[in-house]
Structures are given as structure tokens and as C-alpha cells.
Amino acid sequence: MAKLDDLIQQKQQRDEDWKAKKTAEREELGQLSDDAVMHVTSEPGAYLHYLDTQAINPRYSASNVMLAMAQNPDITYINSLEVWNRLGRSVNRDENGMKIRVSDTYMKDGREYHGYKIGRVFDISQTHGKAGVPALSLKDNTPEMDAALRRLLDSSPVPVVTSSTMYQDAVYDPKTQSITVSSRLIDSKIFAALSREIVHAGIHDHGRYPYYTREDCAMDAESVSYMLCRNFGVEAPQPDVSRVGQVFDGMEVQDRRGVVDSLQKYFRKLQNDIQREISPQERKQPEQNRPAR
């Protein structure tokens, strides 16, 4: 029995060591995530780099994109091992990838709990195999662009009208709660301007957000529109992120993360709606040219 007692004790020690290792790994990843959020929301260059990376990876949360960037600043297009395999690509030997947080549901004492576990993603540069399906690029005067604009109109929380006399490309009026778009714009300019103003209208939320001002919400609206345009290959000016440090100044890391996460979710909703409008068959199958969680 002494031998069995020793084996049991050894197993208990291994279990304790494994739990301690996992706890330390989670704490280390949590600190890395916090540091990444603080960096992105403090430095204009880092924030713009985040927008470019998030635009290519719409199905990953902002937290996970920033976390992956912190481990490899040069990432572009990331996926899990399983998704890369499904796309006909294999991860190169000796590549460890980047750690991210993956939602995890588990049962304990007969109750369901929601938490997260540590997963890994790999950049396309860490893989080899079949060429990926090229991302869709919206062009002026095409059925795809018409479908995208139609979906944007459906997504607008307020009425959209046109004007041939306005000097701006588009503007949301919080007083009338409507968006006016210049009728002199080409399709791609309409796409960029309308998506930006839809975000303004969404933030105002029919007046339920009483603190709305165009100046305060400009960077958020421009950021979402920029990511959407980048995702669909539509030319758009870079947002003015020079004040990013001031915008987030005084905010705790969790609040900063919440703001960036909310922008990603807004972008993802618009991106997904447009993608499905353009490619209805993707309602029945996973996206092939976009990253998956």
C-alpha cells in the first residue's frame, strides 16, 4: 500500500503543479492583454496599426487582436490551426503562434459556467499551402457595391436622404435624427461617408445618449468606417487619431478595453451583414476569406 500511497501523492503533486502553471499562465496573459490595451489606446501609431489589423480579422475580438499584436507586431491575417487546415494550409514546423483567450463553457456541480481557456492563433506568414481565397474588393458601379450600399441603408438607425447642394460628403443631424448624403459622390465615397455617419447615428441612439457631440464621437465613427472600408477594399482616408491619448486619458484599462471592443462589434456587425448580402451562400458555410475565432 505504501507504493500506492506514493503514487497517489505524486499524482496530487502533479495536479497541483499543473494548476499552478495554468494560473500563472493566465495571469501572465492577463497582464500582457492589459499592457496591450494601454499601448494601443495611448499611442496614435499603435491605434492605427490596430485598426489595420482588426480590419483584416473581423471575427476576432478587439482584445484578442491586441493580444496577438503584442506577441507579434507584424501579424496580418490570423487563424487557429483548425481553420488553417480547413483552408488547405499547414502551420510551419516549430511555430508556436500567439496565445489568445477562447470562450469556454464548462459544468461544475450540475451548473453551467462560462469562462475562457487559452488558445493559439497563427499568422499566415507562419503557414504554407494553398493560396487563400482573395478578399472581396468592392468596386464602383457593380452589383456587389449596389448590394453593399443597400445593406448599409438597411442598417441605418435613422432615415437617409440626399442633397445636391451640400458641401460635405455626408452628415448626421442629431436635431432631425437623419443622415444627408451628397448626391455628387461616387459609390466608394458614399460607402465610406455613409458608414461613418451611421455610426454617429448609432452612438446618438435616437437621443438616448444625451452627451453626444460630433467632435467627441468623430474618432470612433471614423475608426469603424475605416475598418469597414479596409475590409472591403474601399479607399478611405485614415481617421484622425492624433488625440487618441487624450480621448482615453484617465480611463481604467477595463473601460478602455470596453470602448475598443464596442467599436469592433459595431464594425463586425456591419461587415457581416454586408458580406452576407453580397455572398448569400455564406449563410450556409463558414467564411473562407475571413479569419474565424
Language model segments and positions:
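N-terminal accessory/interface modules of nucleic-acid-binding and processing proteins
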Residues: 1-293
